């Protein structure tokens, strides 16, 4: 074996490996912070012009449901439909927020295949 050839893992490869490890650590730290941020968020979905509201976290954890007293006389089926619509709205907003934040995280790190 000629001098400097070793196992094909020279100084250049070591620098690449160190950079890859550093990026992986950045992704891990960023993902942890993102998870914490998403858990703290309150994202609101609405139906009936805001008469029914569903609030969930950025990780789609339900927090609360608010129903205008004016709707209580509408009956169970109508209320059920409105709550379901508000839940869908909140879920869509929450998943869109999560997706956007993930794209921001991975895009800023320039990790191939993630951004």
UniProtKB/Swiss-Prot annotation:
Principal cellular location given in the protein's record: cytoplasm
GO cellular component: bacterial nucleoid; cytosol
Molecular function (Gene Ontology), one example: DNA binding
Compartments where located: Cytoplasm, Nucleoid
InterPro entries per UniProt: YbaB-like_sf, YbaB/EbfC
One Pfam family per UniProt: YbaB_DNA_bd
Subunit structure: Homodimer.
NCBIfam families: DNA_YbaB_EbfC
Name the UniProt record assigns to this protein: Nucleoid-associated protein tlr0723
């Amino acid at each position: 074996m000629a001098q400097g050839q070793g196992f094909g893992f020279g100084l250049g490869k070591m620098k690449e490996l160190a950079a890859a490890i550093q990026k992986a650590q950045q992704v891990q730290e960023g993902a942890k912070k993102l998870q914490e941020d998403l858990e703290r968020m309150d994202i609101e979905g609405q139906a009936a012009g805001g008469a029914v509201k569903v609030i969930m976290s950025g990780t789609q954890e339900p927090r609360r449901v608010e129903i205008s007293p004016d709707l209580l006389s509408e009956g169970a089926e109508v209320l059920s439909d409105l709550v379901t619509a508000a839940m869908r709205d909140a879920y869509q907003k929450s998943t869109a927020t999560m997706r956007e934040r993930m794209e921001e995280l991975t895009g800023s790190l320039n990790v191939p295949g993630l951004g």
